[in-house]
């Protein structure tokens, strides 16, 4: 914000389990909030399923344990249904830089923002070479049905292809 004299909001998508903890952790940093925007929104939740038959689990002692967050792939749906997307657009924001919380080196980049503004590109992904520490998260793959490049997560990777998912090259 200081370097570019720009009002860049920092917004967290949390699960129903982490939202209040995140708010409490950010409370001491009063200068993080941008006028008209919350510091976060809550992603959706979905039922936990049994691995053997994919039916919902039942936890009568605590029905809250029957639910789980769908993960970072829920970003687009949660942005829309939470009203956050409408608020951002109404305040004049046109671009978003999205980073997962485990990407601690992520930061807004003026050159990338300029590239979007100049080209009109609807989307771009920042990718890097995997290291020995990169054993989870997504990886790039070529979809067999149409030969398109996709980002594939663990749940989408067949057991016989997990070697590719966890390789370093």
Task: Identify the meaning behind each predicted range.
Residues 1-169:
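Domain-scale recognition of functional cores that engage charged ligands
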